[in-house]
Amino acid sequence: MPVALITGCSSGIGRALADTFKNAGFTVLATARKAEDVAALQGAGFKAVQLDVNDGPALGALSEEINQQYGGLDVLINNAGYGAMGPLLDGGVQALQRQFETNVFAVVGVTRAMFPVLRRSRGLVVNIGSVSGVLVTPFAGAYCASKAAVHALSDALRMELAPFSIRVMEVQPGAIASSFAKNAGAEAEQLLNEQSPWWPLREGIRARAKASQDKPTPASEFAADLLKAVQQDKPPRLVRIGNGSRALPLLANLLPKGLLEKGLMKRFGLGAKL
């Protein structure tokens, strides 16, 4: 029975992936940060692990546990993440650092910790990026930058892990039904205040936080499509799944930069001078 470690399984994409892989016959190690989410996963029959993806010692202990119990790891899905929304200068370096700690640094930290067990099984690393890493939008600069970094790291890891027969897949989801927009909206509201120079544009900021739920693909469909890709004899390097996952990168590549930015500024209320 193949073994899959999936991070960030409390809801949305992560939970759908855990359900789908479990139903396909995988032993699923599903991680979550909060104790109540771990309890819910355990109640659903998962091997649930309470894990902060930036906790190095905990990652090392989990890798050793996987080695002892299963002898290796077939699939690692780096899914844990969130979207920091709002003007870059309102959030500043601190907000950017928090975003990168979860969305970027943890990808390297988790993969590094799991390298020994991935090597034993000649496993597959699946990094969940986003079309936001290809098409950059205002009021999501930190999130877009973090996902662009995940894409670059995936390419580097693919080449560096090839000698060990470990494969790396990059996933660029479009709009997927989840709690992402709700959480992103909460992040934005924490930054919004009347002293911000961008206060008059607050509705545009809120609109960007909700944009990921524009005609979203069900998370279960996303998970089923990703499972098919993972189970291929030669898993693809890049997988795009969900509403907008193909059209938006195409727009980013074909439209002149100035025209694209003008359209995005208009959509999110940045057309007028302040």
Model-derived segments and their meaning:
Residues S10-S11:
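Conserved glycine-rich cofactor-binding loop
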Residues P87-L88, G92-Q97:
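Substrate-binding pocket helix/loop in short-chain dehydrogenase/reductase
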Residues L88-L89, L135-A142:
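Active-site loop immediately N-terminal to the catalytic Tyr-X3-Lys motif
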